[in-house]
Amino acid sequence: MAFLPVGSIPYQQYIKSTTPSLASYLKSIGYATYAQHPYYGSGWNRDTVYPLLGFDNLSFMQDYSNQRFVRKYISDETSFDRIIETYENKPDGQPAFIFNVTMQNHGGYTDTYYGFDNTVTADKLNNSALDQYHLADDHRKIPL
């Protein structure tokens, strides 16, 4: 991103054809390539771009079973379960590259969510946006 103009959206603006990537390289040496994102595939054009980057196997929110949520997003725990499931179901003996972009800590950070305690205790930290932007490591207390 350092070499792109301010405000660039690479997936939408620059990736229009097959583009070399870590995924395409690993695919070329025999890896199964998986891209996972527990949200809409149309977001940032992921459903179109991921194959251009060399990913053969895509999964988006509709593919996640037993969905658990933190705030309004599929939880990291659900996302990690999908990674494990993918790895356990890959062809025996085939290496796998599994790329996963999580959503649990995605903004907006100023909204209020039922059952979500957004309290963070730290000196000089009294901002609702910062309060929401924590790792939700205590998310199991949230009614799922």
Task: Give short role names for the model-derived ranges.
Residues 1-144:
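Solvent-exposed soluble domains appended to multi-pass membrane proteins
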